[in-house]
């Protein structure tokens, strides 16, 4: 097996595997990801086959991963900074990710995490601004986990700004999108707390009733 063919095989398998993972997560396939992966594979294949360049397949795989996953890697870095309470730096990293020509899915994931960081920074209005505009695309493009997370954070932002009707609507959508999940449990807890805050306790089911279902 020639080095150039190994490069081609590694690149092709990389794209196919990641596309398969997107299908398993019920996300829409990213054409940009495929174009970038196959384009880089074609360039490296040509360089090895006709340019006399020697590249180990493992090094090529690492390079391919870093380039095609650049936005998601930055999002993970931003998430780490956010967990450490360094929200300003986390938001700067998310903004950088959005300027690196992300594909649609990666862009939406960056926006979801940016909205969460604003919420943790006690800036719910900014969370609403970021997530409300992106919500429809998130529901269509990404899997139920991301869509539920978006609705939950949006609901919490509405609750903190006193827009309780909007908050309750978002919490209800979480259960519709991703039932029996951690987000659904959090949303139900937040929904009950919101009803109690607004004095609508008659809509909160009793524990005995809840246990029957």
Can you name each region flagged by the protein language model?
Residues 43-77, 81-83:
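Transmembrane alpha-helices and immediately adjacent membrane-cytoplasm interface residues
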Residues 68, 105-107, 144-145, 185:
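Residue signature of alpha-solenoid helical repeat architecture, marking inter-repeat boundaries
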Residues 76, 113, 146, 152-153, ...:
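"A position-specific structural signal for the A-helix of alpha-solenoid helical repeats
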Residues 95-99, 132-139, 173-177:
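Amphipathic alpha-helical segments of tetratricopeptide repeats
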